[in-house]
A protein has these predicted regions:
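Structured, mid-chain assembly/scaffold modules that mediate subunit interfaces
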Residues: 1-144
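Short amphipathic alpha-helical segments
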Residues: 20, 29-36, 160, 164, ...
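General N-terminal targeting signals
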Residues: 41, 45, 53-54, 185, ...
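Surface-exposed beta-strand edges and their flanking turn/coil or helix-capping segments
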Residues: 83-88, 120-123, 183, 237-240, ...
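Hydrophobic transmembrane alpha-helix bundles
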Residues: 94, 221, 288-289
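Extended, charged amphipathic alpha-helical segments
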Residues: 128-275
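Glycine-rich and small/hydrophobic secondary-structure elements
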Residues: 272-289
């Protein structure tokens, strides 16, 4: 499923802010701009949304401006009540830190114009409070493909993608089990005397030389080998699952490692990625960049 996320994320690019009246670019440059956008978009594609907690940073800029801190929080560690019109939060909650046992150590509760930070040792009283003039929370959602029913969007890893990945894993496991049989095809011997010593199956498989004698009637035993199982059915099933996964995600079989004997032309490659290009264009609009 990482292919479905990474191939789309690689096509998203942040160019900057237009009509930057409020100097967003200055605040953005204070928060590791080289990886901030990629981190936020990748998190939103995986969990359908992520959140950016805006707080005051320590110290001031050389120009005397207050430092602003942007903290990315994945969708599994934050939630809130979303405004149907602006798609911003009117109330939000975010986990800030966890211990080694995944227990919550600190969290933030956000309301319009106010952010309160709590810790597990003192859950009833905030240890820090920030106030500001805004009709919305300082917890800002970044949502991928929202709709009227699912306002917090859809994950790039759909249920169909997960089902195809599980089917592919089962196919690979079956092929590994079958490999033990077609690597050592089963053998047989007929016409042995009733008094002949029975061979241990493991000893017979691993021995370099075996001795068979004629029976009491002078007949020689007949040795044979069953036809080895083929890996082809497993490979064909895996390729069929890959085709369904590619159709679900807008990828091509080449993207998934199934290369054809005749390389595709530039036009064919472009046509194969047309669906992914449209998905990336839609994602750009969803993220408002």
């Amino acid at each position: 499923c990482s292919k479905a996320v990474d191939n789309l994320a690689d096509r998203l690019q942040f160019d900057g802010f237009e009509d930057d009246t409020f100097e967003f670019q200055t605040m953005f440059d204070q928060n590791n701009p080289d990886i901030f956008f990629d981190d936020a978009m990748l998190s939103a594609l995986i969990s359908s949304c992520c959140f950016v907690l805006v707080t005051r940073g320590a110290g001031k800029m050389p120009e005397g401006q207050q430092r602003i801190r942007f903290q990315i929080i994945d969708g599994s560690n934050a939630t809130g009540i979303i405004d149907d019109y602006t798609k911003l939060l009117t109330e939000g909650y975010a986990v800030l830190d966890r211990d080694e046992n995944d227990n919550v150590k600190s969290w933030a509760y956000c309301t319009p114009g106010r952010t309160e930070v709590y810790v597990a040792e003192q859950p009833d009283k905030p240890i820090a409070v920030e106030t500001f003039d805004s009709p919305y929370c300082a917890l800002v959602p970044i949502i991928y493909r929202p709709d009227a029913k699912r306002q917090f969007g859809h994950s790039r890893i759909s249920r169909a993608c997960m089902d195809y990945a599980k089917s592919a894993m089962r196919t690979i496991k079956r092929s590994e089990i079958a490999a033990e049989f077609y690597s050592f095809p089963q053998k047989y011997a007929t016409g042995l005397s009733d008094d002949a010593e029975m061979l241990n199956s493991w000893h017979a498989s691993m021995s370099a030389m075996l001795t068979f004698t004629k029976d009491e009637d002078g007949e020689r035993p007949t040795l044979g080998q069953f036809q080895a199982a083929s890996f082809t059915p497993h490979l064909e099933q895996l390729k069929a699952i890959a085709s369904m996964f590619a159709g679900e995600t807008g990828l091509t079989l080449d993207d998934l490692g199934f290369f054809t004997s005749n390389p595709s032309s530039a036009e064919a490659i472009k046509a194969g990625h047309e669906g992914l290009r449209l998905t990336a264009t839609k994602a750009q609009r969803c993220f408002s960049v």
